Amino acid sequence: MFHCIPLWRCNRHVESIDKRHCSLVYVPEEIYRYARSLEELLLDANQLRELPEQFFQLVKLRKLGLSDNEIQRLPPEIANFMQLVELDVSRNEIPEIPESISFCKALQVADFSGNPLTRLPESFPELQNLTCLSVNDISLQSLPENIVFSKCALLEELDLGNNEIYNLPESIGALLHLKDLWLDGNQLSELPQEIGNLKNLLCLDVSENRLERLPEEISGLTSLTDLVISQNLLETIPDGIGKLKKLSILKVDQNRLTQLPEAVGDCESLTELVLTENQLLTLPKSIGKLKKLSNLNADRNKLVSLPKEIGGCCSLTVFCVRDNRLTRIPAEMSQATELHVLDVAGNRLLHLPLSLTALKLKALWLSDNQSQPLLTFQTDTDYTTGEKILTCVLLPQLPSEPTCQENLPRCGALENLVNDVSDEAWNERAVNRVSAIRFVEDEKDEEDNETRTLLRRATPHPGELKHMKKTVENLRNDMNAAKGLDSNKNEVNHAIDRVTTSV
């Protein structure tokens, strides 16, 4: 008597198998039945520790996913996968990449991130069809001395972030098709001049390094839209920045800038400019030429004045200059008719210009202790000038002493939890990186609708998130081991847990 065999057991022509999140400890034996036809194999997020010899008989594979396993070795037999186009072995325990990887000539997308690698194979440039390479978070200390990036001429995305790289080879300028370059979280003190050859580069992230200067040749990045150079040691920005006509996002927060070049006003496509935590005394007059600028953040600088040209930023919607030394806001600010949020808390303002009443503000922050985004103002006269002015219960501004418990920081300043808050009113104010802006509907809308509030916080870059998590974990360990903090350990840990959860 004949029994019907399930159709799937008869079918020897299977091109794709997806076994992700299946708690696999071993590679399933049945996979090898389809060695002649299998082109896509996804074994991500399992508990695989090794790849058996038989595994490398799947020579038809074009896409192989092995991320988030416990694989401890990538055998030299990887060379058998000569038709492989995509390889993802990220977040495993692989200590080295075999030199035989160079035989995978068809490889276009390779992700080795999150492994305990300390070096790349010398043969890596032989992968001449690579378009996307991720080797971030692998403790890489240097690139091969003889690496010739010109052989990887098709490379479009290169992620070297969160390693220990001190120098970049000059040959990086040969990656003429490169669109995205991540170098964040390394030990770079300079960038090679040749980086200016990357005419097609759209995004450059060199945040969290040790850069003291940028090369003038950066002006050659004529396609650049995103430039992130946060958390470095920069004191100046080259005038060549003005030649980046397509630049939309510029983040230079947490550096040592004392001034911005006038050339920044030539970045005609700029929509977001982040200058937080520098040493700026003023902003360039040319900033008024940035007609597309919608978000300008210069919190925690040393600004003593604002140029009247700031009113020329006709698209500006959010303007933050919290914790500076401003004594007045220029009346021309009212010309920025799209402005909805103005944060001037923590300054030395005596009053506000009457012209601000022309703006349709949804939030005007004058103090950390302000309970509502909008206040009731009265008109008065400035007896020194005779001009009409605005005043309220929070003007003139008085120094405040924020506490760590009241204002838990945005992870970038978690060290405040173990340092005493300074008592000096203006000069050495405790760093508070909570830039929270609450939006509410206009008073007219409140009459018709329920009152609603939205808490807006600056969205961290993905690289910053990883740094934030490490900072929180290290701080927790240090504080728990410190003497004299036992009494408030629970309170601090509870605070850190809240921050960790938000990350």
Residue positions per predicted region:
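The feature captures the LRR N-terminal capping module
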Residues: 1-285, 292-295, 305, 363, ...
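Ankyrin-repeat TPLH-centered helix-turn motif and closely related helix/turn capping elements
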Residues: 300, 308-409
